[in-house]
């Protein structure tokens, strides 16, 4: 059985079901996702919502950032669907999503550094410290913030091209889990099988991204969702699995799960 886990990028969206909504999270779990990745925004009066900062014009049709709105106004907003038509789906609070997903899957809380203390308090309030995963860039000032505000949360760092910090961080943070490896081409240090093998020897994990949010920015040297769903999954998801990735983030969790199952049935490298 494949040991690679599937992280659903903002859930599984499509049609009238918008990303980062409770329905998208249910759809992702039904399609076989192991991890739900979601984004966190904070209102002007301090409430945490599940929404990608900066996407207000595209997803809601408004120009005002949620960070400048009060919570009661945010609750009245509705997502737009793929045809730019309002849906019935509002913006969930982080508290609501925590209760929805508690005990069901791991949750990657993206945008963690933007409101680190508030997010960490919410995680503890729901008793979910070992169910979440948080990440930061690999910078000393952020390491110090995590030490102060969230030392009890499972933690990863972004490794862009190379990883120069994991051996230090595993000694510094008891809850250090590994890296989100980002590599625009196959020559990068984190794009080598030797890197994932070394991480595994250290008891650490490597997260990679098959998602494409900008075709001009390669997150995994072109081994992505686009080529996978277009008929070349061996060059996309399969390449990442052969790299030894522990977690693949995708916008197509159902298709990736089906591909993993097919590989296993065919007796290929898990």
Residue ranges and their predicted role:
Residues 1-270:
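Phosphate-group recognition and catalysis centered on beta-loop-alpha active-site segments
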């Amino acid at each position: 059985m494949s040991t690679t886990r599937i992280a659903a990028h903002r859930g599984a969206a499509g049609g009238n079901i918008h990303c980062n909504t409770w329905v998208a999270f249910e759809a992702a779990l039904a399609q076989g996702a192991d991890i739900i990745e979601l984004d966190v925004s904070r209102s002007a009066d301090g409430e945490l919502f599940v929404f990608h900062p900066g996407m207000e014009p595209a997803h809601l049709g408004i120009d005002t950032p949620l960070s400048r709105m009060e919570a009661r106004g945010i609750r009245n907003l509705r997502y737009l669907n793929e045809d730019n038509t309002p849906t019935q789906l509002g913006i969930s609070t982080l508290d609501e999503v925590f209760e929805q997903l508690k005990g069901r899957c791991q949750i990657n809380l993206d945008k963690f550094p933007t409101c680190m203390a508030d997010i960490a308090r919410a995680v503890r309030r729901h008793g979910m410290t070992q169910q979440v995963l948080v990440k930061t860039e690999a910078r000393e000032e952020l390491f110090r913030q995590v030490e102060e505000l969230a030392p009890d949360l499972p933690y990863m760092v972004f490794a862009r091209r190379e990883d120069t910090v994991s051996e230090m961080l595993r000694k510094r943070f008891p809850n250090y889990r590994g890296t989100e490896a980002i590599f625009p081409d196959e020559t990068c240090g984190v794009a080598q099988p030797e890197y994932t093998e070394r991480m595994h020897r250290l008891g650490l994990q490597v997260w990679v991204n098959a998602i494409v949010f900008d075709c001009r920015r390669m997150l995994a040297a072109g081994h992505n969702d686009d080529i996978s769903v277009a008929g070349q999954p061996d060059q996309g998801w399969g390449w990442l699995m052969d790299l030894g990735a522990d977690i693949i983030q995708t916008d197509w969790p159902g298709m990736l799960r089906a591909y993993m199952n097919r590989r296993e049935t065919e007796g290929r490298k898990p």
